[in-house]
């Protein structure tokens, strides 16, 4: 499989905030990128080709339930190629979940990215 991983500006902003707060977060996210390159549709399907992925934040020592959530969108060009957009990332202890309207707004940002 040959999937490119891209981000949108709001994801980059949230990533920067979490990376400053949790020193291990960039390495935690690099593990996620590795997982996505092997299985683009990892996580829980939440509709519109979007998936919610639970990841641990090693420096929090709380496991997946107290870790972060990443919302992805998978656009398949064919069976072997596509693009994975990283739409949102949030700390589970700071934000309970993400609404359908927020996801729709994030999907609109793909077009302008």
Residue locations for each model-derived region?
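Arg/Lys-rich, positively charged N-terminal/basic patches that mediate binding to nucleic acids
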Residues: 1-28
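Basic/aromatic recognition patch in beta-strand/loop cores that engages polyanionic ligands
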Residues: 41-87
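Compact soluble domain cores
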Residues: 24-42
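Enriched for short, Lys/Arg-rich terminal
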Residues: 68, 73-113
């Amino acid at each position: 499989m040959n999937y490119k991983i891209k981000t949108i500006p709001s994801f980059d902003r949230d990533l920067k905030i979490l990376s400053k707060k949790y020193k291990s977060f960039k390495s935690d996210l690099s593990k996620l990128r590795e997982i996505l390159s092997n299985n683009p549709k990892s996580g829980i399907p939440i509709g519109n080709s979007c998936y919610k992925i639970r990841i641990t934040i090693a420096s929090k020592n709380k496991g997946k339930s107290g870790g972060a959530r990443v919302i992805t969108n998978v656009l398949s060009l064919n069976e072997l190629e596509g693009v994975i957009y990283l739409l949102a990332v949030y700390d589970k202890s700071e934000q309970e979940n993400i609404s359908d309207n927020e996801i729709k707004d994030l999907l609109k940002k793909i077009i302008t990215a």
